[in-house]
Every structure is written in structure tokens, then in C-alpha cells.
Amino acid sequence: MSNGTVVRMKITLDDVPPIVSRTLEVPLNIRLDRLHTVFQTAFSWTDSHLWEMSFGQTGFGIPDPEYGFDGPLDARKATLAQVLADTRRKTFRYLYDFGDAWEHSVKIERVTAAS
């Protein structure tokens, strides 16, 4: 897959009536920390809480050594392309704000060449 490949995904905030979701298109080679920024912008949030993307049992975020435990893998060092290829997943989880636990389901709808 080339750098010109685009991923269409739907992100849905779980357990919130009415359904709140966004459909987004991003480059396949986007870093996961930048994908987090896209999610923040799409939902008009302020990026003021911890977050994690989980692909099965593998979590990515911004590690914080002050917590004193093994945290998520560094999202600044992983791309969506790498993680999707490694995990062979079409869905993943996005958790924003560990206190309020805003959980999201993300579904990859389509992967296409950029037009």
C-alpha cells in the first residue's frame, strides 16, 4: 500500500443516546498520535485528557514514565498502516479521558487509493 492510500473509518461514541459518530478519511500512513488529533478535531474536543487506542490486546498512547508501570506503546512511533497490517483488524477501540471513560468503536470501512 502506498503513501497515497486513504482509509475511510467510522468512529462512534459508545453508550451515548442518541448515536454520536463521525465518518473520516485519513492517510493510511498517518501516525497514531496524529490520528488521535484528528479524532479530537472531529468531535470538537480540547485534547485535555489521557487517551489510548487498542487493537485487540495491544494499546497505543503517549507513555508517561511518572505512572511507574508499563503503559501503552508509543503512538508517535506507529502508523495506522503498520498496526492494521500487524493485527489484521478492521476494528479498534479509542478511549478518551480515563476518568470519564469515553469509549469509542472505530470501524475501517474502506481502504482506497487517493484520488
Where are the language model's segments positioned?
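Short linear regulatory motifs enriched in tryptophan with gly/pro/ser
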Residues: 1-115
